[in-house]
Regions:
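N-terminal nucleophile
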Residues: 1-133
Length: 133
């Protein structure tokens, strides 16, 4: 289980304070955070099994994090939740990323997940379990 703590617009000089602990299979290979190729520029670690990420920030100040959640109806071959996290990091802001998350999760192609999309002016949690909200 992953643990995420977020303070949004609490500290005057830091509108987003985020702490995240990834609790994943210790044998699952991953790369440490680094600047990824492409635009916008993104800093994130990479899950080398599925090429996704669990947490990242882009050059616009958008931060996206994913955590697993239960879902009764999981597709037989779900798309990697970490790949969706990387896709959301392509957005210009948190509002757009949250809309993209709702659209993607509504496809039914993912196992259960929560997505936190936050920047200096907007924060959202998209719950992608048996219903999307």
């Amino acid at each position: 289980m992953c643990i995420l703590a977020l303070q949004f617009q609490v500290a005057r000089d830091a509108p987003v304070l985020l702490a995240y602990n990834r609790e994943e299979d210790a044998e699952r290979p991953s790369s440490p955070p680094r600047i990824q190729s492409g635009r916008p520029r993104v800093v994130c670690g990479v899950d080398r099994k599925a090429n996704g990420t669990w947490l990242g920030v882009n050059q616009h100040g958008l931060c996206v994090a994913v955590s697993n959640r239960p879902k009764r109806a999981v597709p037989p071959e779900p798309i990697s939740r970490g790949l969706l996290c990387r896709k959301l990091l392509g957005a210009a802001n948190a509002r757009d990323a949250a809309r993209m998350a709702v659209d993607e999760l509504s496809s039914g192609n993912y196992a259960g997940a929560n997505y936190v999309c936050v920047d200096a002016s907007y924060a959202a949690v998209v719950y992608g379990g048996d219903s999307i909200r």
